[in-house]
């Protein structure tokens, strides 16, 4: 690929579950090796209790999303019941070898969560001590597996609070990716920069506005901004399993459109840049149930447009 006019897209892989780690990550590693791509993996390493989300089906917005994305066939029934009748497996202990494979392949390794379900459901009510414990348990296990400090993190479910930011700062992350947005920013003076996710995920697009597998990739490519920040999140449970072929086709089409997927650290460019200050707002968006964290300036622009 010619480096002239290449648009870089930070590629973030969220690994939420035991199934995604066991099946999705190895498949993605194969795809990345075939296409000479380096990316950023964010691992959940604690108990897989994601089946406990089944109670959220009582909420209309969550049920609508599950039906639209055909969740049972997309994620697998084992994910949908994991951790409901008994505690889920500790992913980082059961599947340590797979996490090490991703690290050995040269990909950037970051922390997603200790307990993804707990973080997504309780982060806004946890005490500072509880928040620190959740981050610390994940950090310690993941750094033990890789044998080095963990350079970055991305909260589960894009759910971040001021208290979360304060606790994260204690771990010395080079950057965090905790929200949706449009540009890199500093949430508070002295804090690590935020690299927000700019593009929608598979389950947010498919089934809406006549978007299906036949035109999904074209829609993602259309949304890439050649003049701005681009960060795309995939999930090991989706693009690494059921949608692996669709994702590999996206990689091929991206190359044809002079788009290059890169690890997120490459988007920072220089260590000495003074990133602008901005805030994180927690609001609800169409396509997802509950609140998500967003870059404040982007929301303000949308409101004034």
Swiss-Prot record:
Residues 7-262 form the NodB homology domain. GO terms for molecular function: hydrolase activity, acting on carbon-nitrogen (but not peptide) bonds, in linear amides. Pathway: Glycolipid biosynthesis; 4-amino-4-deoxy-alpha-L-arabinose undecaprenyl phosphate biosynthesis; 4-amino-4-deoxy-alpha-L-arabinose undecaprenyl phosphate from UDP-4-deoxy-4-formamido-beta-L-arabinose and undecaprenyl phosphate: step 2/2; Bacterial outer membrane biogenesis; lipopolysaccharide biosynthesis. It is an enzyme of class 3 (hydrolase). The keyword Oxidoreductase does not apply. Gene3D superfamilies: Glycoside hydrolase/deacetylase. It catalyses: 4-deoxy-4-formamido-alpha-L-arabinopyranosyl di-trans,octa-cis-undecaprenyl phosphate + H2O = 4-amino-4-deoxy-alpha-L-arabinopyranosyl di-trans,octa-cis-undecaprenyl phosphate + formate. Keywords: Antibiotic resistance, Hydrolase, Lipid A biosynthesis, Lipid biosynthesis, Lipid metabolism, Lipopolysaccharide biosynthesis. CDD domains: CE4_ArnD (cd10939). One of its GO terms (cellular component) is membrane. Its EC number is 3.5.1.n3. GO terms for biological process: 4-amino-4-deoxy-alpha-L-arabinopyranosyl undecaprenyl phosphate biosynthetic process; lipid A biosynthetic process; lipopolysaccharide biosynthetic process; response to antibiotic. InterPro entries: ArnD, Glyco_hydro/deAcase_b/a-brl, NODB_dom, Polysacc_deacetylase_ArnD. Catalyzes the deformylation of 4-deoxy-4-formamido-L-arabinose-phosphoundecaprenol to 4-amino-4-deoxy-L-arabinose-phosphoundecaprenol. The modified arabinose is attached to lipid A and is required for resistance to polymyxin and cationic antimicrobial peptides. Belongs to the polysaccharide deacetylase family. ArnD deformylase subfamily. This is Probable 4-deoxy-4-formamido-L-arabinose-phosphoundecaprenol deformylase ArnD. It comes from Shewanella sediminis (strain HAW-EB3).
